[in-house]
């Protein structure tokens, strides 16, 4: 279902529902205004004024029409006034979120919570080292005096006016918001907005943790499973890293196969410069060097702190989908744009919904008029994702590698690094962290001039100076310099075509995105413009056959041999316009296929020089499924079709892995019927837990999952009552019920088989867990690759040694592990109880709760722990790598209950039709626009979101009037 626009939703006459105690909000009873002043909408009988609000600094009166979803529509005569009002309204509805985001980004959380939670000190240290506040200050200082700076300042002033009312007690914080005193809401500034903007770029593009973890993994794998090991079990696993860590996507779906090619590029793909590789290998330090192991392990505190910071917006597994449909493939004859970025599912939502309409007074220059709607990150003025009258746009993270970590050699006094054989003095910046309940902590951040800051060794909530004998790690990131992202975003507001939008985005440098867009002329376009570093050949001295050498997604030598040489030329940054397929889709996937051969190092530019975009692209299932749905669609696509694709919950892993599970079950039955047929399974079939009748029923269930439901990961519960759907019959509900039972069995099996197959090796290496995506790719590789081509192939068993459990004297086989994991899953189901109609359903365990930003605010979670129906969260369909993202964290437990809840997913579900007569947009955000449990707009959109429904978003004035909840005239005192 695409729209639910017939239901006006819960209404309120109060024009300031998010802050009912604001004394300047005006009369909420619809009484006549106290003066004849009106905003740009004038005196209209179909749009009576419900209240008035005074804001300092306005040049002209502004109208705010709040619709039935709590979305403000701002009508102003100039953009500066509009930004001032947007800042005010955002602070009115999201004050707590603004303050927490600001303090997180600037590294000032400990000032409030350091006594209650000392880990906030570590988090502040980690973010101060990167210096987002320093970068934002430099960025603001570099802004010329003009409209952009005026808009930033006006937005900041609007926020400040609300914060001052909070400090004075004229506006009260929402109930349940404990632990933050009113005086903490200090005045806002343009720098604060820029630091929040850079914080989001940091979360979506800074990946030093990945480089460090990757290097730790490689070092541990090579030292633990060396071919020279005296332990035969370890020796058989030599090459473990090649089977576990796969750079190629499991589903080889790319956005564009038409990237510029040339004979030189193809030649370079097949044979890199061998001399450069040999030369750099001669200089390469020993990958298992104890010194580096000590250096990497010293960053445990830093890595934990960064993980906590990321959880606010982009936890592990974040991603996004978007696509654009050309008018020629659209059922409406107009271009369509779909956008569902997958970010943290929190309360409040990460996005704030708003529309902005700027119309110059009659007789004035109308060339600067703006009519735009969509969503923005609270704290950032304007609109980030959405549409104007002519163009609609969405974005997904491009996953380009724009961060490098360098192993620095220090001089004996620790005050300089060695670079190209010469000492280069470290620069330092003093940081003072205020901490609640104790004295401030003062320390200095050391910075390598040609790379960036040294990453901190955090011990007992303080920074330990690096040991010169061990060295240090520095980080270089494209976001360490001032750039012009906000200018690029504001340019989109006035773009009249996809070409103008692309030109505006040419100013976008940090936090690379796959921007897809469509316009009223029917054209579509994709661009990934960003500052993408080019690197010297020595940074790619990698042998894909042996997994040895140097890659930018691991730790690079800091001696000057693996440096950045510039940025990728603009015309070579992946992009496309109006492709022959009639659509463009992205999902954090490899855009051009450079990693499909599992070698991220051998790409080349048309002239044959190195070309590298990254080595951590998505596993590929979402992109593949989106393309499959669009390609298979009979006839043109409608907005409803796009919404249905956004809600697709086919289990990608189920479709790939269930056939292997069924084969193992068949082989077990063959062994039971004729002992000795498959002797590796004799122990399984003799196990008391092996019940042939039950296994046959499970086999039929899993087989039917594919046959009748195409591996749909259905919730299997009534989304209004939470009761399980009946599983008998042939109706859609019964099919969903059976599919949900199969989904639960499969995912229980999945977490067990990952643990039983890979947990012993990872444990030997010192890892209690690892990336769920890497684990899934490894499992798929073990199942699907030619066995003899596996690095861990054991001739004695004609299969990978990884199937064998290192902790037992027996030699377990592939099928034994598969079936043992299934018995684990069934034993867990037995402990849950229920059968038939009462059998456990996937939706009872696969749930989502929009957790409040801080545990202190748990009563502001959606649903709260006290919710009478959904205390465990909303039941949801989907599973790992589904288009409708709902990835849980792979559990390593064998006996304890796995946690199938999830914390990230679609942060909006936007579909835009670019009709020349006026755009139409449908959307829903997870939660509501106002973070106040007393507001009717606290969780109203959550009811749509959790059922994969959206509503028609009013944009044209007649639609806004029809959806009106209140009109407020905002004017200067």
Question: Where does each model-flagged region fall?
Answer:
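Gly/Pro-rich active-site capping loops and adjacent beta-alpha segments
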Residues: 81-122, 126-135, 394-442, 558-619, ...
């Amino acid at each position: 279902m695409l729209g639910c626009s017939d239901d006006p939703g819960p209404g309120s006459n109060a024009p300031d529902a998010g802050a009912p105690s604001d004394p300047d909000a005006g009369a909420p009873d619809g009484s006549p205004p106290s003066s004849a002043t009106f905003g740009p909408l004038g005196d209209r009988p179909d749009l009576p004024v419900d209240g008035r609000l005074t804001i300092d600094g306005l040049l002209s009166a502004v109208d705010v029409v709040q619709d039935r979803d709590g979305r403000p529509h701002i009508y102003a005569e100039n953009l500066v006034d509009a930004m001032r009002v947007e800042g005010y309204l955002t602070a009115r509805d999201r004050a707590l979120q603004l303050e927490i985001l600001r303090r997180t980004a600037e590294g000032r959380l400990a000032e409030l919570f350091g006594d209650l939670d000392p880990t906030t000190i570590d988090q502040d240290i980690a973010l101060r080292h990167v210096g987002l506040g320093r970068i934002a200050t430099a960025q603001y200082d570099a802004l010329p005096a003009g409209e952009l700076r005026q808009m930033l300042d006006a937005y900041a002033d609007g926020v400040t006016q609300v914060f001052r009312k909070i400090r004075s007690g004229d506006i009260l914080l929402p109930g349940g918001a404990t632990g933050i005193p009113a005086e903490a809401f200090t005045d806002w500034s343009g720098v604060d907005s820029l630091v929040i903007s850079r914080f989001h770029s940091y979360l979506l593009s800074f990946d030093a943790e990945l480089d460090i973890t990757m290097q730790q993994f490689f070092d541990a794998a090579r030292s633990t499973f060396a071919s020279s090991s005296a332990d035969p079990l370890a020796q058989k696993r030599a090459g473990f890293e090649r089977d576990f860590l796969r750079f190629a996507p499991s589903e080889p779906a790319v956005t564009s196969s038409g990237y510029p090619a040339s004979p030189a590029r193809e030649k370079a793909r097949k044979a890199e410069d061998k001399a450069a590789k040999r030369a750099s290998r001669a200089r390469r330090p020993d990958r298992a060097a104890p010194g580096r192991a000590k250096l990497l392990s010293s960053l445990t505190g830093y890595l934990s702190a960064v993980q906590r910071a990321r959880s606010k917006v982009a936890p592990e597994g974040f991603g996004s989908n978007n696509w654009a449909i050309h008018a020629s493939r659209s059922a409406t004859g107009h271009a369509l744009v779909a956008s569902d970025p997958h970010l943290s599912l929190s309360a409040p939502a990460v996005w704030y919904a708003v529309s902005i309409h700027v119309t110059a007074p009659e007789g004035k220059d109308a060339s600067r008029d703006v009519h735009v709607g969509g969503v923005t990150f609270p704290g950032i003025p304007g609109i980030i994702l959405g549409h104007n009258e002519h163009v609609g746009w969405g974005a997904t993270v491009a996953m380009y590698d724009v961060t490098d970590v360098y192993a620095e050699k220090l001089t004996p006094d620790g005050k300089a690094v060695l670079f190209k054989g010469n000492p280069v003095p470290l620069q330092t910046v003093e940081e003072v962290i205020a901490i609640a309940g104790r004295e401030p902590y003062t320390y200095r951040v050391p910075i390598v001039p040609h790379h960036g800051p040294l990453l901190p060794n955090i011990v007992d909530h303080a920074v330990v100076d690096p040991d010169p004998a061990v060295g240090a790690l520095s980080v270089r990131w494209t976001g360490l310099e001032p750039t012009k992202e906000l200018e690029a975003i504001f340019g989109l507001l006035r773009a009249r075509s996809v070409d103008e939008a692309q030109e505006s985005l040419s100013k976008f440098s940090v936090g690379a995105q796959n921007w897809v867009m469509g316009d009223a002329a029917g054209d579509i376009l994709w661009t990934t413009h960003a500052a993408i570093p080019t690197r010297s050949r020595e940074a790619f001295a990698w042998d894909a056959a042996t997994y040895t050498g140097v890659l930018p997604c691991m730790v690079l030598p800091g001696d000057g041999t693996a440096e950045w040489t510039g940025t990728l030329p603009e015309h070579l940054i992946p992009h496309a316009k109006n492709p022959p397929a009639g659509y463009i889709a992205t999902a954090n996937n490899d855009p051009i296929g450079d990693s499909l051969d599992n070698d991220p190092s051998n790409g080349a530019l048309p002239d044959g020089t190195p070309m590298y975009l990254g080595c951590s692209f998505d596993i590929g299932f979402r992109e593949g499924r989106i393309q499959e749905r669009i390609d298979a669609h009979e006839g043109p696509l409608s907005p409803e079709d796009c919404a249905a694709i956004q809600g697709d919950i086919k289990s990608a892993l189920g479709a790939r892995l269930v056939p292997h599970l069924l084969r193992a079950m068949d082989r077990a039955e063959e062994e039971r019927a004729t002992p000795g047929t498959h002797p590796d399974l004799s122990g399984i079939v003799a196990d008391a837990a092996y019940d042939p009748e039950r296994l046959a029923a499970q086999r039929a269930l899993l087989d039917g999952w594919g046959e009748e439901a195409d591996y749909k990961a259905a919730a299997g519960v009534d989304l209004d009552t939470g009761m399980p759907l009946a599983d008998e019959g042939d109706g859609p509900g019964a099919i969903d019920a059976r599919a949900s039972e199969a989904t639960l069995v499969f995912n229980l099996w999945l977490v067990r088989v990952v643990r039983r197959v890979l947990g012993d090796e990872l444990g030997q290496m010192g890892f209690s867990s690892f990336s769920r995506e890497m684990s899934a790719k490894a499992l798929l590789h073990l199942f699907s690759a030619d066995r003899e081509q596996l690095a861990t192939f054991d001739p004695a068993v004609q299969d990978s040694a990884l199937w064998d459990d290192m902790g037992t004297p027996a030699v377990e086989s592939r099928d034994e592990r598969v079936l043992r994991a299934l018995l684990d899953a069934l034993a867990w189901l037995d402990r849950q109880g229920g059968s038939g109609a009462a059998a456990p359903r996937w939706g009872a365990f696969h749930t989502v709760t929009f957790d409040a930003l801080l545990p202190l605010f748990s009563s502001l979670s959606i649903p709260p722990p006290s919710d009478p129906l959904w205390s465990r969260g909303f039941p949801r369909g989907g599973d790992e790598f589904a288009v409708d993202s709902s990835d849980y964290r792979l559990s390593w437990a064998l006996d304890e209950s796995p946690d199938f809840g999830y914390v990230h997913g679609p942060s909006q579900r936007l579909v835009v039709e670019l009709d020349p007569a006026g755009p139409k947009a449908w959307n829903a955000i997870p939660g509501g626009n106002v973070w106040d449990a007393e507001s009717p707009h606290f969780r109203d959109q959550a009811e749509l979101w959790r059922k994969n429904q959206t509503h028609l978003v009013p944009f044209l004035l007649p639609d806004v009037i029809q959806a009106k909840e209140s009109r407020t005239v905002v004017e200067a005192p």
